[in-house]
Amino acid sequence: MPSGGQRKHTISNKTRKRPGKDLDQIHEDLKPEKAAKLLQQEIDYDLPGNGQFYCIECERHFVDEKTRQLHRKTKLHKNRVKTLKEVPYTQAEANAAGGSGFFPAITLKTRVELPKQPEIPIPVVAET
C-alpha cells in the first residue's frame, strides 16, 4: 500500500482504464445537428438524471440541472472549453507536416465559436 503522500498521485483505475472521448470526437459532437440530438436525448433510466442533463464538452451526465450549472462554473469544465476552442488538425495538414502531400497555405489556427446551449428553466416545486 502506498503511503498517504503517494496515494494522492496515483490515477484511479476508472480514469486509467476507461478513457473518455478524444478531442476530435468532441469537436464532432459540438456540431449543431449532433449537439441538438445529444441535448434532447430520450429517457434512459441507466444514466444519471435519466440522461436528460448532459455536458457535451465534458461528455458527462448529471443528476439535475442545478448540478450541471454548478459543473459549468468549475475549473475542469472551463479548461475543457478552453482546450476545445483550438481547431483540430485536418488530415491534409497532418500529411503536409509529415512530408507527404502538399498543403498550399498553412494559416494560424483560429478559434471555434461553441454553440450556445439553450437555457432550460428549472421547475420550482411549491412547498406544501
From Swiss-Prot:
Q: Spell out the subcellular localization from the entry.
A: Nucleus; Cytoplasm
Per the record, the coiled-coil ranges are none
Give GO MF terms, alphabetically. Answer: zinc ion binding
Annotated region described as Disordered, given as residue ranges: 1-29
What SUPFAM superfamilies does the record tag this protein with?
Answer: beta-beta-alpha zinc fingers
Q: Which GO terms describe its biological process?
A: ribosome biogenesis
Question: Which intervals hold the zinc fingers (C2H2-type)?
Answer: 53-77
Specify the domain of life of the species encoding this protein: Eukaryota
UniProt lists compositionally biased (Basic residues) regions at 1-19
Q: Which GO terms describe its cellular component?
A: cytoplasm; nucleus
Q: Where is the composition biased (Basic and acidic residues)?
A: 20-29
Q: State the UniProt keywords alphabetically.
A: Cytoplasm, Metal-binding, Nucleus, Ribosome biogenesis, Zinc, Zinc-finger
Record has Cell division as a keyword = no
Protein's job: Involved in pre-60S ribosomal particles maturation by promoting the nuclear export of the 60S ribosome.
| Family that this chain belongs to | Belongs to the ZNF593/BUD20 C2H2-type zinc-finger protein family.
| Subunit structure comment from the entry | Associates with pre-60S ribosomal particles; released from the pre-60S particle very early in the cytoplasm.
Q: What is this protein called?
A: Zinc finger protein 593 homolog
> What organism is recorded for this protein?
Caenorhabditis elegans
Mind giving the lineage of the organism this protein is from? Answer: Eukaryota, Metazoa, Ecdysozoa, Nematoda, Chromadorea
